[in-house]
Amino acid sequence: MTPSTPPRSRGTRYLAQPSGNTSSSALMQGQKTPQKPSQNLVPVTPSTTKSFKNAPLLAPPNSNMGMTSPFNGLTSPQRSPFPKSSVKRTLFQFESHDNGTVREEQEPLGRVNRILFPTQQNVDIDAAEEEEEGEVLLPPSRPTSARQLHLSLERDEFDQTHRKKIIKDVPGTPSDKVITFELAKNWNNNSPKNDARSQESEDEEDIIINPVRVGKNPFASDELVTQEIRNERKRAMLRENPDIEDVITYVNKKGEVVEKRRLTDEEKRRFKPKALFQSRDQEH
């Protein structure tokens, strides 16, 4: 883009051209930037149309301010904003939801300003009043209305019901399934014999312990079975099952007999049981 001179402003004011009578010193001073006249400027709205008022709380206390002023300098008022102490106790009576009568008493209010801003005169007066009357300095709590009391009682009942519901919802052992020490003692220590007999017979009963018979381990003992014992065992097995020597039986997984087949002489020789422990007679 080719640079060009910007268009001339319409509101531009030109300086007066120097006349022929102008001195050379005036020409050497140079030209000044033209300024617009002040009457062409847009009027500005003032920040406020009224004069500022003198705020008494923002200004320091004036010596002319007397008792008519609500501020009265930096001293505290000598009267409490609470009701006068001459007003005695007032009874607030209302009926609760259970047709009962509730009464609350409002204690007279003390002068709090003398405690916050004490003076020598006020200290003496307060000491005398405390000795005589013993007034309460702090204001008492406000009386409770019948509606607030009713709502508080309903809230307490709801909280108790909610706690009971939470206790019931918590999982626990049923009462009929709880095992006590007495029940465990009856299960483990009492036998049918003891229940049938009297308490005296239980005390005098002799305990008989039968000896436990332990079978002999043939692999750990040095004793050998004789041939007579072997033949006796063989005859007992043949009496129970005569086909035990030459018949093979097939059973399924349920233990039911599926098939029986007789063995050949070759199979008898192969499947013949062998004695693990031989006697001295067989060895020789």
From Swiss-Prot:
Q: How is it modified after translation?
A: Phosphorylated by cyclin-dependent kinases CDC28 and PHO85 in association with G1-cyclins, promoting degradation of SIC1 and exit form G1.
| A biological process from GO | G1/S transition of mitotic cell cycle
GO CC annotations?
cytoplasm; nucleus
Q: Which residues carry this modification: Lysine derivative?
A: K268, K272, K274
Q: Name one GO molecular function term.
A: cyclin-dependent protein serine/threonine kinase inhibitor activity
Residues bearing Phosphothreonine?
A: T5, T33, T173
Modification sites for Phosphoserine? S76, S198, S201
Q: Where is the composition biased (Polar residues)?
A: 18-52, 61-79
Name the UniProt key words of this record, in alphabetical order: Cytoplasm, Nucleus, Phosphoprotein
Function noted in UniProt:
Substrate and inhibitor of the cyclin-dependent protein kinase CDC28. Its activity could be important for faithful segregation of chromosomes to daughter cells. It acts in response to a signal from a post-start checkpoint.
Q: What else is known?
A: Present with 768 molecules/cell in log phase SD medium.
Recorded protein name is Protein SIC1
Please report the organism this UniProt entry assigns to the protein. Saccharomyces cerevisiae (strain ATCC 204508 / S288c)
> What is this organism's lineage?
Eukaryota, Fungi, Dikarya, Ascomycota, Saccharomycotina
Q: Which gene underlies this protein?
A: SIC1
